[in-house]
Amino acid sequence: MRNYLVKNGPKPRFYALLAAPLLVILSSISVAADGDFVPRTADQKPDFNGIWQAIGSAHWNIEPHAADFSPLVELGAIGAIPAGLGIVEGGSIPYTSEARAKQQENRADWLALDPVVKCYMPGVPRATYLPFPFQIIQSPDHVVMAYEFASASRIVYMDRPDFEAPIFSWMGHSRGHFEEDSLVIDVTDQVPDTWLDRAGNHHSDALRVTERYTHVGPNTLMYEATLEDPNVYTQSWTLKFPLYRRLDENMQILEFKCVEFTEELIYGHLRKGANAE
């Protein structure tokens, strides 16, 4: 049997064909290990310019969740909440008991209470995993994040580490720096009104978010955000998910101001005859 295998086994050319894909794989691993896929700016910083988008159901609930009915049952399947594995490391946000009770209250009436429903700015990190693309525009001194939802935006100050926020705001105050090939952004001074998702996950005005953007492929970033808020959480916690570059031809951020879609929701009761029988 041993002689038969030697005599009639694969020819050298067959071995060469098997080896070729292996060499490609090993070459790819080598490139990835060397970080050669990381694009560079003119000053050799990692280049994050582009239009990016998250894929998933984290905008419904960042914790693991089953599929559920929509609060508007008339919408049927198209309004149903999709299941999700969650993006919170460890699976659960470490709330205080009072803060968890507040989250449950929020969730029970999210359609009336979620600020995003009324087109308020989503805040950070929520803006990153809404089902809308966003654009990163990078220069040596600033990084601009332009979000399609509500035309929200923020400026990351790369050259002013001591610049304090003059006021609290919906998108907070962002200061950034590089740690090796990662873009790290410190976000503070957000108003306490923003939520983290439609499930009512929340924070106070003491929230501090440390974001980290890292290239893990030519068209993929890994996004991490560590949240600290001693008024709401018992310890710091991290959420993590990939962002994908939008490669659509002529891809651009389009207008979705959304205010015009909420006017009736917010001001409809003031319309003449609105309460008429």
What are these regions (language model features)?
Residues 15-28:
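Bacterial N-terminal signal peptides
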Residues 2-3, 30-277:
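PEST-like low-complexity, intrinsically disordered acidic/proline/serine-rich tracts
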Residues 1-15:
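N-terminal secretory signal peptides that target proteins for export/translocation
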Residues 8, 26-27, 31:
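Intrinsic disorder/low-complexity segments, especially N-terminal tails and targeting/processing regions
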